[in-house]
C-alpha cells in the first residue's frame, strides 16, 4: 500500500495514510510530475519573487527523502557533500550555522490545542546556548547581543485564484517540490507579544539544526544540507514540552535533510535566469546532482528501477518462483567474507592436520582499498553494482553481449587512484553466475595437469574479453572500467612440485609491487582464495549458502599495524547519563581538566552459532545454567568482547579522552576527526604499548553499519564475535610481511594441531570403530563405578563420555587434555558440553577440565600446561589457596575432592 507524507510545520514528515484523490494538498494527479513542475515554476515566477519585500519571501523548495521509504543517512549526507564539491559548489562555513526552531501550541476557536503556523527561530550557537539556560524567549530578546538572533516566521500555502498550489511529488525519485510563502512577523505584533509573555507556560516542540549551505555561480540555487535533532516523539508527532531538557532535543538521534531553495536574488530581469525555462534547466540539473550524490553514480535511476534490479538479482539466485514482495536485507549479499590469516594457516604442511593452509592449493591477489560490490548484468544488458547494504547503483554502462545477460560477478569498486584522480575502476575477483548458470561450484584456478576447460578465473577473463561495455548515452565514452584482478600463481603446481613455494613467491611479487608504487590504486593487504573449491564450500565441488557468510577457507592478510576490529560502542552510564571522569593534574584549574568516557566494546554474538563466550571460565566461576534453561530468544545480540585467545576479561573496556567540538561541547572523536557517541559502530586499532584500558584507538566511524543498526535494516553490531576473536588473535600473534613473503621464520603452534583435525575431518569414516569403542567404555564405567563416586579422565578430549558419567550417577569428574580447543571450544568443547547438559538433565556430575599432558605427574602439577591448570589441580587435591575470589566458586566447591585420590 502506498502512503503519502505531509510536511509538518516542524519540518518533519507525518504519514497520513493511503493516497486519497480527495486530499487537496497531496492529491495524486494524472498529469506527469515533470509537467506539473513546469507549471509550478511558472506560477512561482509569475509572483515576481525577485521583487524585494522586507517581510515576505516566496520559497520554491525541493526536499529529498520525502517518500518515507528510505530516510536519509550520514552516508547520504557525506556523499552529497563530496559530489557537490567535485562539481564546483562551495560553502562559506563548512562547520555550518546553528538554528533552534520552536513550534508552540495555542487554543483555537473550538477550545482545542493546535500547533501554530508561526515558528520561533533562534540563530547562532551562543544565542541558543543562552536560551537553554532559562528557556525564556522574552529574556533572550531583552539581551542586546542576542535580540537580533530571534525571529518569528509564518509559513503558509500559496493560492492561485482561490485554488491551493499543490506540491509536486516525484515519488519514483524520492523528492518533492513545493511553493510556499514565508512572512516574518514583527515582535510588536499582538499575537507575538501574547506568545512571548506566556512563553514559559506554553508547550513547544523543538528542532535543533546544524545547516551547511552550498552555492555555485552558475546556479540560482542554495543547497541546504542539515543535521537535525528534534523533540521526543509521540507516534508520528513531536511531543510538546516546556523546555529543551524535557524535550531531549540535544540527546535524541540525529536525522539528515537535504533541500534545494531558489535564491530570489539571482533570478529575474537582468540576470541569467530571467524566465521560467532557464530556471527549470538549472533546477533540473541541481536535482540530478543531488540524486547523483545519493545514489553514488552519475547515472541516477528511479526507485522502481532499483527495486526491479534487486528482484531480478534475487530471481537469479532463487529461481523465477522467488516471491518479489519479500523484503531484501543485507544478508542477501552472497559474496562471502574472509577470515583473518593466522599463523596456523601458513605453517609447513602436516598430514596430521586438516587446517586450511595457503601452502596447499591457494592463489593470492592484492586487497584493493575499495568498496566491495556485486556486479549484476540484467536481462537487458544494463550493468548495476550492488553494495553490501543491498543498495543498487546503475553504472551508466550497458552491453549488447546477450551471452552475458543475467550474470553476476564479485569485485571492488575503486573510485580514485593514488593521486586522488577519478578512475572508476571495477576490479573483478570472482564470478557466481553466467547467463543464469550457477558456476559457483567450479574451481577457481586450473591445475597444471588438469584437462578441465571451465574454471572461474578463466570464465572471468573470457567474459570481460567479450563484454564490450559502452555508455548508456550514445557517443559518450565508457564511464566505468571493468577489469579482472591478477592472481598468483596463474597455474597451480601439482602437490609436491613447489606449490607451497609459489604462493609465497606470489605474495612477495605483489608486496614488492606495492613497495615500488606500481599499483595504480592504494592497497591494504592480500586476499587468499582456495584454487579448487567452490565458492563458500568446504570441499571440491561444494558451495556455501546463498546468503551473507564468512568463508572458512578464504583469508585476508593486512600488515600487522592495520589489523582492526569493528565494535559497537556503548557508553557507561549513571542515571541514564554518560559517566564523564576528570583527569586531575596539579596546577590546572577545574575548567581545564582533561576528561574521558569509559565505553564498552561489543560485537555480535549468537550462542547457537558461536557457542559460549568463555565456557571454561563460566565453569570455574560457577556460572552454570539450571535444568530447563532455554536458549535466548534473541539469538543474535551485542555482547561485551572478552576474548579467549589470549584471554583478557577486560579487553572490552576502553577509555576515550574527550575533545571540544566546534561548539565547545566535549565529545569522543575518531582519529580521522569524526564525532561518535553511544550506539555507534566504530573501527578500532589496538596499541599494546599503551596503558591498560587505553589501548583501543578509534580510527573510523562505520556509518554504513551504524545506519543498518539504527534503522533496523539488520542486526549489525560491528564484527561478529568469532571474527573479532580471529582479529584479536592476529593482533597478538601477527603474520609478518617477512613470513608471508618467504614462508620462513614461522613460529610453532604446538598444541593446536588437533583443533583443526577434530573440527574439520569428517567423522563417518571412523563411525564403526567409535561405536565399538563407546560400547566397551560404557560397560567399563558402569561396571566399576558406584553412585556418588569421583572419576579422573586422562586425555578426556571433548568430554564425549559425559552421557556415560551421567548414567553412572557420578558426583565429580576431573578431565585432563593436552588440547586447549578440546576443553575450551565455545560450541562443542568439554566445558561447553557440561554447560549444555546442565540445561537438559536434572542430575549431572560436577566437572572441571584442565589443560595438561596426562603422561606426566598430575598431582604435583608438572603435567599442567598453564598456571590456571596448576592452581585448579592443586585445589582438587586439597593444596594451595582456598580463596574463592582467586579460584572461582566452581573450583572452590571441589577443593580437596581428590585429597585421597579418585574412585575411578
Model regions and ranges:
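Conserved SAM-binding loop of SAM-dependent methyltransferases across substrates and taxa
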Residues: 798-810
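Phosphate-end processing signature that detects enzymes handling 5′-triphosphorylated RNA
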Residues: 4-7, 11-323
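Nucleic-acid 5′ end/cap handling module spanning
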Residues: 60-65, 158-167, 226, 322-384, ...
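Class I SAM-dependent methyltransferase Rossmann-like catalytic core
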Residues: 749-786
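Conserved SAM/SAH-binding beta-strand->alpha-helix loop
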Residues: 819
